[in-house]
Amino acid sequence: MGEFKIQSRFKPTGDQPQAIDKLVNSIKSNNRAQTLLGVTGSGKTFTMANVIEKLQRPTIILAHNKTLAAQLCSEFKEFFPDNIVEYFVSYYDYYQPEAYVPQTDTFIEKDASINDEIDKLRHSATSALFERRDVIIVASVSCIYGLGNPDEYKKLTISLRTGMEKERDEVIKKLIEIQYERNDIDFSRGTFRVRGDSLDIIPASYSNKGIRIEFFGDEIDRIREFDVLTGSILGERNHVAITPASHFATSRETVDKAIGIIEGELEERLRELNAQDKLLEAQRLRQRTNFDIEMIKEMGYCSGIENYSRILDGRASGTPPKTLIDYFPEDFLMFIDESHVTLPQVRAMYAGDRSRKNTLVDYGFRLPCAYDNRPLKFEEFEKKINQVVFVSATPSAYEIDNSEEIAEQIIRPTGLLDPEIIIRPIKGQIDDLYGEINKTIECGFRILITTLTKRMSEDLTKYLIELGVKTTYMHSDIDTIERMKIIRDLRLGEYDVLVGINLLREGLDIPEVALVAILDADKEGFLRSETSLIQTIGRAARNSESKVIMYADNITKSMDKAMKETERRRAIQKDYNERHGIVPTTIIKDVRDIIEATKVAEEVEEYKAADKKKLTKKEKDKLIKDLTEEMLLAAKNLQFERAAELRDIINEIKDGK
């Protein structure tokens, strides 16, 4: 059994050692909740990794979006190359849930595009939890949605060993029961093929390698791993566990029992609808549910089977669904990254799902059991937590009030201080800002400006461009790839100034930025709350020459708290540096990473700019080959937005052939 072991040339420094000790001691003392209050650039991820190494427990890390989850996953893979680090996010590239609009009598069928690579990673994550303890799963908040029952999933897993008495046809029958398909032509993930006494399987958690089971009579003679593409043998196995092809797979006995319960719930609901004189709704419900029942009888599943998950799991009405968290052993550890953003997302998910289901049930599209195919309520989520560490530079009152231990991480390994904050009047703010921009550009640094409205951002960008300042504007309509391209161009000096509204907070760490300007800082509200201000100030904490200018006529409560907190941190950092003889230094990250991240965006733009009809067949083939290699690399690096963009371009080129 593997143990967590960090591989890094760095050792904990600054505030990291005491933060690690505090968190580890608190968790070992069986405290349920603790907070890691770490300033921007203090190495919170490295602290988390050290806590995991010291505690040696299976760990789930929650992030508030797919991009941040992918970034964290990459970092933890670097820290723990010899352990299992998995990625678990929603597998939908596109998802339109089924819905009904009574006003126009419009029913919208469920429509989804499933990303096969992410589905593979989800299966890889759940199967890893049954095989090892040195497992870290980085997940988005979608992990609080219902997943199949882990007990059923484990029960349906096929365990095969060399020397085991097992007939080939018996194994085939079991594979079909757990939703594998026989396909001798298109051999892909979740399928198997038969060749004489050999049975080839590509498990749900694999894609580029398969398992070959060789039989001698009614005995398993040999188990081998092979490369799906080349067919070459990769190694011998004594044992293999084949997990179900779907998390919602269920045994035949469970299905047969569930059908009777579904039929009973249908009859009860039909009586209710008929009593209310809702004859159309009753007819619709009877027709749709009977069709589902027939499909389940014949195939073992149906489209939308998750709406019957409560019955298939044998749960009582209103009880919480099984989720990824239930796949973990009891002593698991949870980190909630950027908890001030992630926890509100968890709170909001149930309400949105419930309002949509109400309409579907009221108008006869679904049985009431569909209500229980849902995300967890916040109280249910809390109950499922064993021990948790909230991670944030600006934890909310919930995290502070519920934590038995708060570990502050104020000192940065680089010795950098929190930026100096200057207050200037609103009158003449643009002229003053223009002067500060010129001073900053002369020193070779960049500027971030945050405004309150889209209109003001656009006008300011236009004004600065007219004055000859290389300025761009980042708004909410810009997709992930374009956003990364803008950041890359800012770092490379294509732009000197970036203007935005609420986009200059979490995750935008640019060492070249030496000035952050906050316009209309005294306008109280969401964009100028204490949390927002501290996060925005943090964008200037990667450069030793940085400062923040707030343009305001009054000092609001939020401003006052943000400034006092920043000054408190700055004083601690300054004192530490003086005592240890540390000179703050700007750590300039290699721009190569950013260039690699935006390479696809450039290739896509070049392709769109070219008239593909003018390309020769040879040129098209080369372009497809290059883009396919880039797409596979992007998927391997968990950069799925880039991979999807490339896939669409490749299809477009092929269609134009």
UniProtKB/Swiss-Prot annotation:
The keyword Cytoplasm belongs to this UniProt entry's keyword annotation: yes
Compartmental location: Cytoplasm
Protein name stated in the entry: UvrABC system protein B
Entry keywords, A to Z: ATP-binding, Cytoplasm, DNA damage, DNA excision, DNA repair, Excision nuclease, Helicase, Hydrolase, Nucleotide-binding, SOS response
Family: Belongs to the UvrB family.
Keyword flag DNA damage: yes
Gene Ontology CC annotations of this record: cytoplasm; excinuclease repair complex
Domain Helicase C-terminal: 429-595
One Pfam family this sequence matches: ResIII
Superkingdom assignment: Bacteria
Subunit structure: Forms a heterotetramer with UvrA during the search for lesions. Interacts with UvrC in an incision complex.
Domains (record comment): The beta-hairpin motif is involved in DNA binding.
Species: Clostridium beijerinckii (strain ATCC 51743 / NCIMB 8052) (Clostridium acetobutylicum)
Transmembrane parts of this sequence: none
GO MF term list: ATP binding; ATP hydrolysis activity; DNA binding; excinuclease ABC activity; helicase activity
Motif placement: Beta-hairpin: 91-114
Residues that bind ATP: G38, V39, T40, G41, S42, G43, K44, T45
Annotated GO biological process: nucleotide-excision repair; SOS response
InterPro entries cross-referenced by the UniProt entry: Helicase/UvrB_N, Helicase_ATP-bd, Helicase_C-like, P-loop_NTPase, UVR_dom, UVR_dom_sf, UvrB, UvrB_inter
SUPFAM superfamilies: C-terminal UvrC-binding domain of UvrB, P-loop containing nucleoside triphosphate hydrolases
Domain Helicase ATP-binding: 25-182
Described function: The UvrABC repair system catalyzes the recognition and processing of DNA lesions. A damage recognition complex composed of 2 UvrA and 2 UvrB subunits scans DNA for abnormalities. Upon binding of the UvrA(2)B(2) complex to a putative damaged site, the DNA wraps around one UvrB monomer. DNA wrap is dependent on ATP binding by UvrB and probably causes local melting of the DNA helix, facilitating insertion of UvrB beta-hairpin between the DNA strands. Then UvrB probes one DNA strand for the presence of a lesion.
Boundaries of every UVR domain copy: 621-656
NCBIfam families: PRK05298.1 (NF003673), uvrb (TIGR00631)
Gene name linked to the record: uvrB
